[in-house]
Amino acid sequence: MKNICLYVWGLLMLLVSCTPENRVIDKPVFLASNTTSIEVSKVTLTDSTTVLDIFARYTPGWWIKIASTGYLTDDKGNTYPIQAGHGVELDKEFWMPESGEAEFQIVFPPLKRGVKYIDYIEAPDVEGGFIIWGIQLKDNQLPELKFPKGFKETEVDKNASLPEVKLAYGEAIIKGHVLDYREGMPNKATVLVYSPLMGYTNADAEVDIAPDGSFTYTTQVLGPTTGHVIYADKTANFYVIPGETSELCINLREMSRKVSKFHADAQPYGKELYYNGPFAALVAENAEANQLINRGRSLSKEELLSVSMEDFKKFEITVTEEQKKAVCESSLSEATKAYALTALSNRLLASLDSAPSRIISAYIDSKGDKYDEDDVMAYYQKLMKSVPTDYASELMDVLDNPVSLLSVAYASMVSHAAVKGTTPKNDGLFAQMVGTAKISRGLTDFQPLTEAQKEEMKALPEACQQYLNAKNEELLATIEANKKKTGFRVNETGEVADEDLFASIISKFDGKVRLVDFWATWCGPCRMANKEMIPMKEELKDKDIVYIYITGETSPKGTWENMIPDIHGEHFRVTDKQWSYLCDKYGVEGVPTYIVVDTEGEIKYKSVGFPGVSKMKEELLKLTK
């Protein structure tokens, strides 16, 4: 009998040691999150379940979804799969009410005893899946923030002037560290470096995160210029100078806290970014400076319809002067004030440059269902006739100030002038940058430098010449490499009537499931979607699916020929007349547009715009055996 009692007592002790004590953690702090759409408002631990109360906030009338593949992991490596949802149906669209806020629960098995924190993770194959790391269960406090060995943040002297800004070309190194990084977090980050000629040009620059949270990215830049690191849907801003290194430590816990529903007003978890590199004051005061730069008033759509171009200009100048006054009276460092004042002048010019498009957009919106293309064109022509040739000439001097290179508005002015073929009146920095951008546009379209362009380049600054020569060498190497690539095929449409063209194209692949992609070489979303679908195409390579790409003459032939080697599939380039017919007939209202055709030649799905890899894969698999 004694042995039986001891056995029962031991069994009870074992059960107690394996299950958590019943308790509730209200508004638990967490390490980081990749979303602001959901947040844990309460954790309830019992011997039978673990329940997360979820507070959701999202656009009213839009939906979110909780995946049935979601799970919890704890600090000991144990996994707890999701069991049920209360107030939300797993894998079903949860439509947000008018308030944009909602609450529901998700249920998991009981945690093992002694768990300090949990992560909520939706499976890796869930596109845009929610992740919340380090939900604290013990004392509701985060562990001490630890920095990489040897890192030292640049100290900011509030009285120091902005360092001299000199145009240069060369290698810049970005060294980063994701603080609190651990296994299970995303192992890649995106580094974007701004080009003062055309904005972001390296949007696909992914870098690997090492197990210790560090990463390094090296690039050739024309600058100085600005850059961003995007990780777990959080963005850190910095600056780069050719020949120098920028070091940054990304504090995910503070970035997540600032946008938290329940902890935004709590004591900060340090700085969002710790930085050692060029223009340290600008980085340290980035948020405060941007608030002053971006807080200006703007005209409503109704006001835009009644304002003259001259009145628009007066309004924008008044607002800019108000913003400059606020900058001068702020507590910003002298360096950041100098930058902010220049950035505001650049922003003013960019705003004046965009005035016609803003007014036209307001006019189109005002017409609603009565929109008429001829009417809009007449309105546009009348508007443009009212714009003086010297509309903003007295404000242009700031574009020759090298500090303008640090402003994101500068590239829009340079690229717009290059596209319009505008030739600035003087031969200052702006004229030099526009001249460089004009030549660079050809390289972007896979057109190597001509002898005439090489001669023209001699009048440009040495840095611009170095940049163009380097880009030309890269292009020549790419063209040679493309000659050896396989996996794509150029097809001729042949002599066929417009009304038979689509049927003729898809009939070449009868008996197969066909994904038809209407796209263009100049379309950024098209190019991004093509890249995102590469893993999907590899995964479905054993399925009987053909990928058909149709573009028109707006895609320059040379650009198209050198872009398609990296887009595996069947390619067609049609005439402007054929393109117009196809767009009208099949409702191609913009690019990209996707049409899925079954094995019998019937259209089963269409999407204007990229619907995402998951949706595309779902529609294709519906039709495959």
Model-derived features with residue positions:
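Short, well-ordered beta-strand segments enriched in hydrophobic/aromatic residues
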Residues: 49-58
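Oxidative protein folding and maturation machinery
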Residues: 164, 169, 252-512
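A non-transmembrane, solvent-exposed segment enriched in polar/low-complexity residues
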Residues: 86, 129, 134-335
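Short, solvent-exposed, Trp/other aromatic-anchored flexible loops in extracytoplasmic proteins
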Residues: 81-126
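Conserved helix-turn-beta segment immediately C-terminal to the redox Cys motif
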Residues: 512-513, 530-551, 618, 622-624
